[in-house]
């Protein structure tokens, strides 16, 4: 990753594995592994929280825990909240928290809560109306995964997409939304909806360190953003994107090695 010499790294969530049913002791060890990797990066990482980054969110009876399961992630990255915004190269990045803990057999779902939507309303009042926006989300807003790989997804669509994504997109309908970056499902995918590109960026672990996942090899998305002046040009003129495969080597840790 350092050899690419990026100006910025968007960490799309799931910095560790497990989270929902693993003990805090196990998760602490996995965070140490993640810390070893992240400290080797030469470029600033702007993180998004993923469902595996949660810390003991579910009790033994599968009900939601009363404590804040996001505290470990927030402490590690030095952030007060799991959603925020920042500007880079003329673009405003909106970093969202798309995981809602619900417990039960499907312990989470893709959802933007009311507090975050209220924050977004306030944030949009602060952002200049002509500033192009890049939306970053762990769980996808748009994906074909359920149509293409139905047995993998099962009966719960909230496992693979944000169920109230339109509550966010409707707030941005009169804004220059340039791009939506997504993660979670470990596939390399680009969709377009109403002229907006939705890019799902694969995963550095592929199929959890076991080769490709549904045709997508371990890798990462490389995006080149060109400064914008006087509004948005067509997508392919202002932003270029490609998926870069990473070599799978014995040095990559398997889940059992950090359990």
Regions found by a protein language model. Name each.
Residues 135-141, 178-188:
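Histidine-centered catalytic micro-motifs
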Residues 221-259:
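A short C-terminal boundary segment appended to hydrolase-like catalytic domains
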Residues 13-14, 50-51, 96, 138, ...:
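Active-site glycine-centered loops adjacent to acidic/histidine catalytic or metal-binding residues
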Residues 16, 127-145:
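Short acidic, glycine-rich surface-loop motifs adjacent to enzyme active sites
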Residues 21-132, 155-159, 163, 167-179, ...:
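Extended active-site neighborhood of metal-dependent phosphoesterases/phosphodiesterases
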Residues 141-155:
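Active-site His/acidic residue clusters
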Residues 1-27:
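N-terminal active-site segment of His-dependent metallophosphoesterases
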């Amino acid at each position: 990753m350092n050899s690419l010499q990026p100006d910025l790294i968007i960490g799309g969530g799931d910095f560790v594995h497990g989270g929902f049913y693993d003990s805090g002791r196990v998760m602490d060890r996995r965070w140490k592994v993640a810390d070893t990797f992240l400290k080797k990066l030469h470029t600033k990482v702007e993180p998004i929280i993923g469902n595996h980054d949660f810390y003991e969110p579910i009790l033994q009876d599968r009900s939601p825990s009363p404590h804040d399961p996001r505290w470990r992630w927030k402490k590690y990255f030095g952030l007060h909240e799991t959603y925020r915004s920042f500007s880079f190269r003329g673009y405003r990045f909106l970093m969202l928290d798309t995981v809602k803990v619900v417990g039960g057999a499907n312990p989470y779902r893709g959802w933007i809560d009311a507090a975050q939507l209220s924050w977004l309303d306030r944030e949009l009042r602060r952002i200049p109306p002509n500033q192009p926006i890049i939306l970053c989300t762990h769980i996808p807003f748009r994906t074909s995964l359920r149509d293409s790989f139905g047995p993998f997804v099962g009966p719960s669509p909230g496992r693979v997409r944000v169920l109230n994504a339109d509550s966010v997109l409707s707030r941005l309908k009169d804004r220059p939304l340039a791009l939506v970056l997504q993660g979670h499902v470990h596939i390399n995918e680009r969709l377009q909806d109403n002229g907006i590109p939705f890019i799902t960026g694969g995963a550095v672990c592929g199929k959890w360190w076991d080769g490709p996942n549904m045709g997508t090899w371990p890798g990462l998305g490389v995006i080149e953003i060109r400064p914008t002046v006087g509004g948005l040009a067509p997508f392919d003129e202002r932003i270029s994107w490609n998926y870069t495969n990473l070599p799978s080597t014995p040095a990559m840790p398997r889940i059992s090695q950090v359990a």
